[in-house]
From Swiss-Prot:
The gene is rpsF. GO terms for cellular component: cytosolic small ribosomal subunit. InterPro entries: Ribosomal_bS6 (IPR000529), Ribosomal_bS6_sf (IPR035980), Ribosomal_S6_plastid/chlpt (IPR020814), Transl_elong_EF1B/ribsomal_bS6 (IPR014717). GO terms for molecular function: small ribosomal subunit rRNA binding; structural constituent of ribosome. It comes from the Bacteria. Binds together with bS18 to 16S ribosomal RNA. Belongs to the bacterial ribosomal protein bS6 family. This is Small ribosomal subunit protein bS6. The lineage of its organism: Bacteria, Pseudomonadati, Pseudomonadota, Alphaproteobacteria, Rickettsiales. NCBIfam families: S6. Keywords: Ribonucleoprotein, Ribosomal protein, RNA-binding, rRNA-binding.
Length: 121
């Protein structure tokens, strides 16, 4: 198993409940294949650098995961098929830090996003 960091952008008009359902679907795939979710972060609704389709903003979500390459391919396949996800990127990492990501550290306290860190030894 290897560490991966995955960031995906969900359309701006998707509700927070629907975002939770999307993330739960990915979580189920990971756990069903003996993977581990080390860190989940919702980075909030952010303005995109350029318009993607009709979207000027998007909900950013980060997953720090420990999975096999086959599970990574399955997650990416599901992301491609989900019409609510407008962009995604998954990269291999040496390790996943339990600290909040730099994006969370730079955000103002009035927009406090959700962070869920689980370290399994």
């Amino acid at each position: 198993m290897s560490f991966y960091e995955s960031v995906f952008i969900i359309r701006q008009d998707v509700s927070l409940n629907d975002i939770d359902k999307i993330v739960d679907d990915f979580t189920k795939i990971i756990k069903d294949n003996n993977g581990t979710i080390i860190k989940k972060e919702y980075w909030g609704l952010r303005t995109l650098a350029y318009k993607i389709g009709n979207n000027k903003k998007g909900h950013y979500y980060f997953l720090g995961i420990d999975i096999t390459s086959n599970v990574k391919e399955e997650l990416e396949r599901k992301m491609k098929l989900n019409e609510n996800i407008i962009r995604f990127l998954t990269i291999k990492a040496d390790s996943i830090s339990s600290e909040p990501s730099p994006i969370l550290k730079n955000q103002s306290t009035e927009n406090t996003p959700v962070i869920d860190v689980t370290i399994n030894n």
